[in-house]
Amino acid sequence: MLLNQGIFAMHIRYSEMKMRAISTLSGLMRHHGTDPREFLNATHQFPELGDMLVHENALRHALMRLGGRKLVFSNAPRHYVEQVLGAMGVRRYFDAVYSIESTRYRPKPSSAGFHVLMRAHKLDPHRCVFVDDMLENLRAAKRLGIATVWVSHGVTKPRYVDVRVASVLELPRHVFRNARG
């Protein structure tokens, strides 16, 4: 999802809320027997989603220029991820979508989800690139041998981040020799 400068701070707060919601879901499942499908359905209802997203035609062009297979790996429920990708007009540029349901409700940064995705697509982690805005997720990917790209306006790049970009539109300019496949 591309975010303009005006809503960047809101995105940071939302990212923090996502991590709390994921922790909340795990706790509700473990301690209260909550049905994760019901929880995720109730917490991911956005009738005005299309109006909430920043649409940039350049995103489609950037995705077309990226080589290799492209997979979406999200902690959100499938219906929401598909809705976002569809509203942005980019679904066709991705080979597969992995949602929290795909990982049996073990969200990033758990390595379990990465393993599910890599097994299903017969991926060598040393030939993959993981792009995310959450450092915890990037750290988990790096531990598995995956090259990492941090989408952030942050200045200090941690050691486990290979490349920092301010926008996903910058991705085609970065070539990863180890990410063919």
Please name every model-derived segment.
Residues 1-57, 79:
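N-terminal helical cap/lid subdomain that shapes the substrate entry/recognition surface
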Residues 11-13, 46-50, 68, 101, ...:
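Short, contiguous strand/loop micro-motifs
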Residues 18-21, 32, 70, 74, ...:
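Flexible interhelical turns and helix-capping residues at alpha-helix boundaries
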Residues 28, 49, 69-70, 91:
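A general structural signal for well-ordered secondary-structure junctions
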Residues 37, 64, 71, 77-78, ...:
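Asp-based, Mg2+/Mn2+-dependent phosphohydrolase catalytic module
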Residues 50-54, 72, 105:
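Short, surface-exposed alpha-helical recognition segments that flank or form part
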Residues 58-67:
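Catalytic-core regions built around general acid/base machinery
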